Structures are given as structure tokens and as C-alpha cells.
Amino acid sequence: MITIKPFESTFTEALISFILDIQQNEFNLPIKREDQPDLANIPDEFQQGNSNFWIAVDGDELIGTIALTDLGSGKGALRKMFVHRDYRGAVHGLAKKLLDTLISWSKEKHFSDLYLGTAEKLHAAHRFYEKNGFELVARNEVPDGKYIMPVDTKFYHLAL
């Protein structure tokens, strides 16, 4: 059974391996563990104030992640959205469930805008975000912050 729940520290190493495998091996993105020190400290980096980090598990297996970083002034950044290749697509609807979890939380916490940055080569992700109401925007329309990775070249906005 698939469950979406807030991140628990027992998943730290599995989460780091999961994300790096997708970034490096599946999409050949030039991102290393050292580029993402926040992954080793999810509770302090993502689970404070109005920010949060959720994981999707099938039994004990980590199959998806999504995070929200509070940027202040009602703005948030969608971060670390990853879904295991075997759980992608409409059959499972896992990406949509993860996004719905984040959006529901964002509305409860009175966010007005969500932003995200993504890599050019992640075409399926672009289609997913656009299908779910995100609009492509210029880099200068996105609030600055450490959530923007060097590989991010496409930026999106969603008004809540």
C-alpha cells in the first residue's frame, strides 16, 4: 500500500541514495551529494515553520519525495520532487498525489505563490507541471534562494 507522510529520519540514507540515483544515473545531471548538503539534515532544513518534506512509501520502500521551502511573504518553493521510475505515470498517479499533498499544505499555511526550478532535459516533468497549472516564467520572475540549483534552467510559477 502506498502512503504519503512527512519525512522521518530513519529514511535519511535511503532518501539520499534514491535522489542521487535519479539525478545522476537516470538523468545524467551533474549533481553530487556535496551539492545538496540539505539532504543529510531534512528536519532542520525542510521541516521548520511552514516548510515541510514528504515521502511516499510502498510498504518500507521509498518511492517518492516532495518538499516545500517557505520563502517568506506567502511564497514557497517546490523542491526535491522525485518519483521512482516504476511508479511514474497516470497508472499510479503518485506524482499528482505528492503535488496535491504539497498544495493542500501550502493553502492551509496561506501561501499565495509556488515556484520551482528544473533542468532543461526533464521534459516529462515540464509537461506534468504545466498540466497541473504551473506557468513557465523567466528566471528574474522567481525569488532568489538556495533552492535554485545550478542545473535549473526552466522556472515555473503557480498562483494558489
Regions found by a protein language model. Name each.
Residues 27, 107, 147-149:
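Residue-level signature of transmembrane alpha-helix interfaces in integral membrane proteins
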Residues 6-87, 99-101, 105, 142, ...:
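Acetyl-CoA-dependent GNAT
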Residues 61, 75, 84-100, 108-109, ...:
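Conserved glycine-rich acetyl-CoA-binding loop
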Residues 1-3:
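Extreme N-terminal starter segment of soluble prokaryotic enzymes
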